[in-house]
From Swiss-Prot:
GO terms for biological process: lipoprotein biosynthetic process. It comes from Shouchella clausii (strain KSM-K16). Its EC number is 2.5.1.145. One of its GO terms (molecular function) is phosphatidylglycerol-prolipoprotein diacylglyceryl transferase activity. A 1,2-diacyl-sn-glycero-3-phospho-(1'-sn-glycerol) binds at residue 137. The chain crosses the membrane at residues 18-38, 54-74, 91-111, 115-135, 177-197, 205-225, 236-256. The keyword Nucleotide-binding does not apply. It comes from the Bacteria. PANTHER family: PHOSPHATIDYLGLYCEROL--PROLIPOPROTEIN DIACYLGLYCERYL TRANSFERASE (PTHR30589:SF0), PROLIPOPROTEIN DIACYLGLYCERYL TRANSFERASE (PTHR30589). The lineage of its organism: Bacteria, Bacillati, Bacillota, Bacilli, Bacillales. Keywords: Cell membrane, Membrane, Transferase, Transmembrane, Transmembrane helix. This is Phosphatidylglycerol--prolipoprotein diacylglyceryl transferase.
Length: 277
C-alpha cells in the first residue's frame, strides 16, 4: 500500500487574498543575509556604506528577471501552451546561472558609473552570493524540485536526515535523492573556504574567481545527479556545459590578470577605486 505523506505547504502565510510563498521568503532571506554580509565587509574595505544597498536596488529585480528568462528559454515547451504561466514565479522555475549573469552585468555597469572597481565589488560579494544560494536552495526543497535519482526511505535514513526532510523527498509515491541539500551544503562549505582565502590576501578579483570555480565544480557534479535539468538539444545539460566554460574562463582570467594586469591585493585599502577593468 502506498504511503500517505503530505508535503510541506508551499504557502508561508496567507494574508487575506494574498499568499506569500516559502519559495519567495527563502530567496529573499538569502538575499538579506548576503546583503548584510557584503555591507559589513564593504565598509572594512573602504567602500561607501550605501554601496551594496544601491547596487541591490538594481541587481535584485534584474537578477530575478534574467533568472526567469534563462529558465524559460531552455524550458519553452513547458510554457508554449500557456505563455502567461511565464509570470507564475510562485511555482518556481528560475535558474541560478541566469541570476548570476544578470547580477554580474548589473554590477559591471554600476561600478563603472560609480567609479569603483568591479573586481573589488565582486570580491566583497563572493561569500555573500554563496550563502544566498545556500539558503535559496531550500526554496527548491519546499517546492519539491531539484532532486536526484529514486532511492528508498532506508537510504535517506542512512544519511541521518531528519524525518521532515525525508518526508519532503517523497514525491508522487517515490523517494528521491535530496540534491538540493548537496548543493546547499557545498555552498556553505564554499563560504568557509572563501572567508579563509579572504585572509590570504589574494590579488583583486581572485576571490570572486575562486567563487566561480568552486560553485561551478560543485554544480557540474551535482547536476549529473539531478533528474530535473535544462537541456541544450536532446542530451547536453546546460548547467554542466556552462560550468565547464566558467571554470576554464575563471582560470584563464586568473592567469592573465596575475601575469599581465598585476592588480592590487584584496586587503589594500586603496584598491576600491583602482583597476576598474
Amino acid at each position: 500500500m502506498e504511503e500517505q505523506i503530505e508535503p510541506i505547504d508551499r504557502v508561508f502565510v496567507q494574508l487575506g487574498p494574498i499568499a506569500i510563498y516559502w519559495y519567495a521568503v527563502l530567496i529573499l532571506l538569502g538575499v538579506a543575509v548576503g546583503y548584510f554580509m557584503a555591507r559589513r565587509e564593504s565598509v572594512k574595505r573602504g567602500l561607501p556604506q550605501e554601496t551594496f544597498a544601491d547596487l541591490l536596488v538594481w541587481a535584485l529585480p534584474i537578477s530575478i528577471l534574467s533568472a526567469r528568462a534563462y529558465y524559460v528559454i531552455f524550458r519553452w515547451e513547458q510554457f508554449a501552451d500557456n505563455p502567461i504561466s511565464v509570470f507564475y514565479l510562485r511555482e518556481g522555475g528560475i535558474a541560478i546561472h541566469g541570476a548570476l549573469i544578470g547580477a554580474v552585468v548589473t554590477a559591471i555597469v554600476f561600478a563603472k558609473k560609480r567609479g569603483l572597481s568591479f573586481w573589488k565589488l565582486a570580491d566583497v560579494a563572493a561569500p555573500s552570493i554563496l550563502i544566498g544560494q545556500a539558503i535559496g536552495r531550500w526554496g527548491n526543497f519546499v517546492n519539491q524540485e531539484v532532486y536526484g535519482a529514486e532511492v528508498t526511505r532506508e537510504f535517506l535514513e542512512g544519511m541521518f536526515l531528519p524525518d521532515w526532510i525525508i518526508n519532503q523527498m517523497y514525491i508522487n509515491g517515490t523517494y528521491y535523492q535530496p540534491t538540493f541539500l548537496y548543493e546547499s551544503l557545498w555552498n556553505v562549505l564554499g563560504v568557509v573556504v572563501l572567508l579563509l582565502l579572504r585572509k590570504a590576501n589574494l590579488r583583486q578579483g581572485e576571490l570572486f574567481l575562486s567563487y566561480v570555480i568552486w560553485y561551478s565544480v560543485g554544480r557540474f557534479v551535482i547536476e549529473g545527479m539531478r533528474l530535473d535539468y535544462l537541456l541544450i538539444g536532446d542530451s547536453l545539460r546546460t548547467a554542466q556545459l556552462l560550468s565547464i566554460i566558467l571554470v576554464v574562463a575563471a582560470i584563464a582570467l586568473w592567469v592573465y590578470r596575475r601575469l599581465w594586469v598585476k592588480p592590487p591585493r584584496y586587503l589594500n585599502p586603496d584598491a576600491a577605486t583602482k583597476q576598474r577593468k
